[in-house]
């Protein structure tokens, strides 16, 4: 009997990001909360100080909650500017989640106390902005400014889900953060839909008998 060789998935190496030349103030922008059935989509914009680096920045999803919470005050203290933008469930239902995310990113950039020369956006598309912008695929892993933005947005949204959990403990929002899990589906089936649910999302529409 011939033993089969184990196949391991090759790790895809991301190319290092080359920052465009000629820009003084660069903002990184990221979002959290496109997939959940409940709550705001939250974005953050961050301009880091190149003379005051922050160790350990990475995509917020790759960091433990403890590490994110430890990095948050350091990011806020050392950044030249940071701001949070959001769109509510009502706006998401009106615009659709993609457009609402773009609007939330615009709000985060507008909220910066210093306006950047360039905005680096995580993903493959940019919102309309008054300054130059560039989409960076996997930017939360490749660009420190985007990593910092992802950490702020993630912590802010998670904390909002924990607050919502206090109002509606039967839904378990602190655990699944509003994402479409089995426990969330069962809670909707048992307790119905709350005002913070996104009514345009298929499982919620179905629960409301609109699908």
From Swiss-Prot:
Q: Does the keyword Aminoacyl-tRNA synthetase apply?
A: no
Q: Where primarily located?
A: cytoplasm
Q: Which reaction does it catalyse?
A: Endonucleolytic cleavage to 5'-phosphomonoester
Q: Which GO terms describe its molecular function?
A: manganese ion binding; RNA binding; RNA-DNA hybrid ribonuclease activity
* One record GO biological process: DNA replication, removal of RNA primer
Domain of life of the organism encoding this protein: Bacteria
- One Pfam family in the UniProt entry: RNase_HII
Q: What is its EC number?
A: 3.1.26.4
The UniProt keywords, alphabetically, are: Cytoplasm, Endonuclease, Hydrolase, Manganese, Metal-binding, Nuclease
Entry binding sites for a divalent metal cation: 30-31, 122
- PANTHER family given for it? RIBONUCLEASE H2 SUBUNIT A (PTHR10954), RIBONUCLEASE HII (PTHR10954:SF18)
**Name of this chain's protein:** Ribonuclease HII
Recorded source organism is Vibrio parahaemolyticus serotype O3:K6 (strain RIMD 2210633)
Q: What's the source species' lineage? A: Bacteria, Pseudomonadati, Pseudomonadota, Gammaproteobacteria, Vibrionales
């Amino acid at each position: 009997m011939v033993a089969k060789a184990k196949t391991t998935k090759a790790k895809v190496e991301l190319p290092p990001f080359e920052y465009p030349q000629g820009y003084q103030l660069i903002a990184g922008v990221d979002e959290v909360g496109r997939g959940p059935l409940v709550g705001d989509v939250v974005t953050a914009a961050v301009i880091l100080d190149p003379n005051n680096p922050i160790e350990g920045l990475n995509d917020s999803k790759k960091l433990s909650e403890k590490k994110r919470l430890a990095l948050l005050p350091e990011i806020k203290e050392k950044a030249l500017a940071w701001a949070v933008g959001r769109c509510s469930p009502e706006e998401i239902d009106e615009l659709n989640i993609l457009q609402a995310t773009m609007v939330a990113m615009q709000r985060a950039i507008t909220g910066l106390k210093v306006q950047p020369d360039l905005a680096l956006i995580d993903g493959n598309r940019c919102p309309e902005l008054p300054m130059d912008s560039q989409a960076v695929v996997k930017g939360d892993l490749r660009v420190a400014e985007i990593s910092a933005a992802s950490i702020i947005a993630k912590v802010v949204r998670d904390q909002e889900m924990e607050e919502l959990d206090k109002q509606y403990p039967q839904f378990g929002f602190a655990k699944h953060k509003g994402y479409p899990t089995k426990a969330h589906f069962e809670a909707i089936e048992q307790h119905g839909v709350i005002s913070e649910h996104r009514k345009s999302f298929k499982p919620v529409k179905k629960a409301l008998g609109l699908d």
